[in-house]
Amino acid sequence: MLQPKRTKFRKQMTGHNRGLAHRGSKVSFGEFALKSVSRGRLTARQIEAARRALTRHVKRGGKIWIRVFPDKPVTKKPLEVRMGKGKGNVEYWVAQIQPGKVLYEIEGVSEELAREAFALAAAKLPLATTFVKRTVM
């Protein structure tokens, strides 16, 4: 699973996930990309599940880039514990996603295969996504 090696603080406030993605919104490494259309949170498990779906479909061909990293801790109190007594323990890590954020990139495969692979990966994610190609200026 993806998670930071070390952080300055163990726990973070919930915060807001507003606005559009300006950074990480262009296809930078590969030819084709899976881009978010809606906002939400991706857990480390969801990112890994989609990555596995991608790599299994493209088999030996192509190179894949993961453009998101879960760097925000989400806490949860144990079951059947009364409210109060401080914030719960870190349960899992999430990446906050805004519309326009590139999630995965791929190169070295045909467009048809890339579309199929991204469709399988998108089924594992709780966000609406779209397929984009690299634009050469």
Swiss-Prot record:
GO biological process, alphabetically ordered: translation
GO molecular function: rRNA binding; structural constituent of ribosome; tRNA binding
Pfam families recorded: Ribosomal_L16
CDD domains: Ribosomal_L16_L10e (cd01433)
Gene3D superfamilies in alphabetical order: Ribosomal protein L10e/L16
SUPFAM superfamilies in UniProt: Ribosomal protein L16p/L10e
A GO term from the CC aspect: cytosolic large ribosomal subunit
Keyword Ribosomal protein: yes
Recorded coiled-coil stretches: none
Keywords (A to Z) from UniProt: Ribonucleoprotein, Ribosomal protein, RNA-binding, rRNA-binding, tRNA-binding
Function: Binds 23S rRNA and is also seen to make contacts with the A and possibly P site tRNAs.
Quaternary data: Part of the 50S ribosomal subunit.
PANTHER family per record: 50S/60S RIBOSOMAL PROTEIN L16 (PTHR12220), LARGE RIBOSOMAL SUBUNIT PROTEIN UL16M (PTHR12220:SF13)
Family: Belongs to the universal ribosomal protein uL16 family.
Name this polypeptide is given: Large ribosomal subunit protein uL16
